[in-house]
Amino acid sequence: MHPTPFLRHFCLALGSALACAPAYAQLRDVELKAAFIYNFAQFTVWPDMGRAREPFLVCASPDSALWSSLQSFNGKPVNGRAWNTVDIATRPRPGDCSVLVLARSAELPAPAPGMLVVRDGAGRGAAIILVDGDEHIRFDVDTEAATRNGLRFSSKLLRLARNVL
């Protein structure tokens, strides 16, 4: 007995969907991480540095898996300023960035007033570290690293963190 054409097509479609599931999950993780970063910015208390009329610069590498998802927030407001994702290589100083998104292996720049450093993966020196695990994205907060850059976090953000250092 041979399978019907419908059953053959159904099995082929199911197999294709299952093969694509890990890629979809990866894409979803990247979008979630970008949304986390946008919300981190919303729940950060920034020092008054006279930048009220300037764009809210989010610096990252275009090679980062997060790049296009971070760009999807361009134009959205953060404390009355428009989010603008830019290539870190085009900034003369990392301190020009309101948020600096680093890959796990990227070198940490010197502290800069008003700059929130978020690292995607384990590492030291960032104020917020995104952590993958147990099918969830979690984050750790280093309040000392934030304080070095003149930043404070909302208690709401701190309550959601996996660890607060």
Language-model-detected regions and their locations in the chain:
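Short hydrophobic alpha-helices and adjacent helix-cap/hinge residues
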Residues: 2-8, 22-165
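Bacterial N-terminal signal peptides
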Residues: 9-19
